[in-house]
Amino acid sequence: PEKERFSSLVADQLQMKHLNRSEAGLSNDGILRKTIKYCEKEPVDFAVIQFTKYSRREILNIKKPLPDTSPYLRINAGNPSKGVKEYFAKLSTPEDDIANFYKNKFLIEFYLTAKKIPFYFLQLSKKIKRGVATDRWLYHKSAWDEDYFANYRSSWQKYGDNNKPVDCIYQILGGDEDSGSPYFTSSKRPHPNAEGHRKIADHILKKL
């Protein structure tokens, strides 16, 4: 339920109105674009940005008829098209994913700072365990134990606060559904349960 989401819990505690702009399957490129588009039109007192998996990407699909709600082709595990499979199998690299993450983080940070909008960042990326089928590894079988943020660097990290780690949802919740954390639903696509959202909200409130 919406009232149990961490965004609602934080807003209720602060006695503020809020708008949850989350969108399933959106890439960090899309999060950057939507954030700027909204902030250019509406007054914002505070922004909590949750970055998604760094392997999610998007490209402008010029063949898609306009106007359309989203002329962007989403490149993620939820899109099983041939082009997406080819991208993950032959083009995607951890170096490029990390560079793109830090680029988007820097641009959102720069924009919000220029607009004098206070912000707090979270992210969803986590250490990949051997054999886990997630995005790239759905189509490319060379999975291995990997901590992307520790092992891959980007020139974008020189800018802004990019050398400071972004708090990860899975760290806040003490792991993920596979490691036995009690803060997730038991569905095929696990998400934080009510207790998990409460824990995330408490973490954000401590950071404000």
Regions found by a protein language model. Give the residues of each.
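Alpha-helical cap/lid subdomain in secreted, periplasmic
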Residues: 36-208
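Serine-esterase "nucleophile elbow" of acetyl-processing enzymes
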Residues: 1-30, 36, 40-41, 192, ...
